[in-house]
């Protein structure tokens, strides 16, 4: 009790990276350790999926790149500016997609999610490629007392049997 049970395989259709949102990266903390705002979302994502890859280290954490939609720019009339603002992040996303086959990018910030859903197609990505951290957890969570839990327990038992047979 008190722990979430996650089935990472529920997100196997995604190869994921994470966008450090400006406001979270520069103006907040998470947890009780320095840098928690960078490490906690990544730990949650790694616990929720089997295929996680960081973007270029120079473009994440304290060095994160803007989504291009913050600061009051999130309006369709300013789409040209928003697209130019998103270009550096889209370049970093393209690189991790080319190297690791990344198909989705998670973000915490609702502004970033709204921005990316509009600009991703302009850079050759599906607009559905932006997801949230809580969406990844929601996909993977195994609810207690559900048929999903029964399936999970069955899988876990089969995996344990297979591991025992290999020893």
Region roles according to the model:
Residues 1-167:
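Iron-sulfur cluster-binding electron-transfer modules in prokaryotic oxidoreductases
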């Amino acid at each position: 009790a008190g722990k979430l049970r996650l089935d990472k395989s529920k997100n196997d259709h995604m190869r994921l990276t994470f966008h450090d949102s400006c406001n979270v990266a520069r103006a907040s903390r998470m947890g009780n350790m320095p840098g928690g705002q960078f490490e906690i979302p990544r730990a949650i994502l790694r616990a929720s999926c089997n295929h996680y890859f960081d973007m270029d280290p120079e473009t994440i954490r304290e060095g994160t790149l803007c989504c291009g939609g913050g600061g009051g720019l999130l309006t369709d009339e300013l789409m040209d500016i928003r697209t130019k603002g998103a270009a550096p992040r889209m370049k970093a996303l393209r690189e991790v997609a080319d190297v690791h086959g990344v198909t989705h990018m998670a973000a915490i910030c609702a502004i970033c999610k709204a921005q990316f859903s509009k600009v991703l197609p302009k850079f050759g990505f599906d607009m559905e490629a932006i997801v949230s951290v809580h969406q990844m957890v929601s996909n993977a969570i195994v609810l207690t007392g559900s048929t999903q839990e029964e399936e999970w327990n069955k899988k876990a038992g089969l995996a344990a049997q297979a591991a025992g047979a290999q020893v």
